């Protein structure tokens, strides 16, 4: 006779792949035009000077330069800009 009962089954054991969201280039770091600065869902960080926004709300540099983060307005919204290289 078998020494073990059947293993049964479970409804657990699944998880989605991580989406690798977040800041990719931090304040003060150099970036090339087209380089991704932030990957995000929604506009947690807003686009400032020389920063474009993709259809998935990804922020990217429009010019070569250095990344600069700031907090703007009464609502204290975070904004990222690119200061052009001299």
Curated annotation (Swiss-Prot):
| PROSITE patterns found in the cross-reference section | RIBOSOMAL_L27
MF annotations from Gene Ontology: structural constituent of ribosome
Question: Among its keywords, does the record have Ribonucleoprotein?
Answer: yes
Q: What cellular component terms from Gene Ontology apply here?
A: cytosolic large ribosomal subunit
Alphabetically ordered keywords of this record: Ribonucleoprotein, Ribosomal protein
Which InterPro entries does the protein's record reference? Ribosomal_bL27, Ribosomal_bL27_CS
Q: Could you name the domain of life of the organism this protein comes from?
A: Bacteria
**Gene Ontology biological process:** translation
Q: Which PANTHER family match?
A: LARGE RIBOSOMAL SUBUNIT PROTEIN BL27M (PTHR15893:SF0), RIBOSOMAL PROTEIN L27 (PTHR15893)
Belongs to which family? Belongs to the bacterial ribosomal protein bL27 family.
Q: Cite the NCBIfam families for this sequence.
A: L27 (TIGR00062)
Q: What is this protein called?
A: Large ribosomal subunit protein bL27
- Taxonomic lineage of the native organism: Bacteria, Pseudomonadati, Pseudomonadota, Betaproteobacteria, Burkholderiales
